Amino acid sequence: QCYVSQACFGRSANRGECAQFCRLPFSLVDADGKTIVRNKHLLSLKDLNQSEVLEELLDAGATSLKIEGRLKDVTYVKNVTAAYRRKLDAIFARRKEYTRASSGTCRFDFQPQLDKSFSRGFTHYFLQGRGGEITSFDTPKSLGEEMGTLKEQRGGYITVAGVKPFHNGDGVCFLDEQGRLQGFRINRVDGNKLYPAGEVPRIKPRTRLYRNFDQEFERILTRKSSERKIGVCWELADTSFGFSLTAADEDDNRVTLSFPYPKEPARTPQADNLRSQLAKLGNTPFEVAGHLSEEASGIRLNLSENWFLPASVVADWRRQVIDRLIVAPRVF
């Protein structure tokens, strides 16, 4: 816990109101009044990143993880949670003694990458012993992903030595000769030539260039690019007065509704049509568990005969059952 924000500004960092005291610039002066360091962010630490040691954390007994995300936007949260979700799922696939705390399956239409979201550089601090730089003295702002170095600068463009592609609209930053963070927005990209929007900043050759805003990546994240689906199993059965439809999800929630309906033998096989209708879960948080086959546990047809049931009737029953299942308690 940290109390410096409360002591200096009356805002408690332990209650989500940190005043970011540690991100301010300071000068370091010795006992003789000699300035050792001037106007550097001497208390600014890099961001904690334990994504590469998740398995060790699980083996040590960790059962939940806290992800840095105070005052971050939706694209940050989506990218970071997706990165950890994928790594954890890969561990769970190998280590059957571990299971996720919540139900469902998460899918992403993008490749998560932590250094594309806000970060001051990463550190694991002292989890694996002392070693490596943990501070970010030059700037408390986001550097982003390292893209290469400045090869040359002439006219209205700069040339980058690097293999990662830039996009129109990307944000680029660098540390100037005084160690101050500078940056510009790219107006146009032509191969490894970048044409900045506005005045071209003066950059020393071989200066490291970072991308702290990826236009294309942000565009992907702002649209629907992830979903979570909870597996559900169906059972359609006939009763003495009609039919019953049961849905059971991964959280052991179960809903059964009975529907009076006349029984009429069908002229053609109905199994495929019934499975198709029950599988249409659309924008609900559910999907059929398993595969749509006769042997699958996802959809079971417990019918004494090949009854005729119109698609519209089955669809209505399906909606009624799902509406009940949605409000059932579950772990998110």
Predicted regions located by residue number:
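Surface-exposed amphipathic alpha-helical tracts and adjacent flexible/coil segments at the periphery
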Residues: 1-332
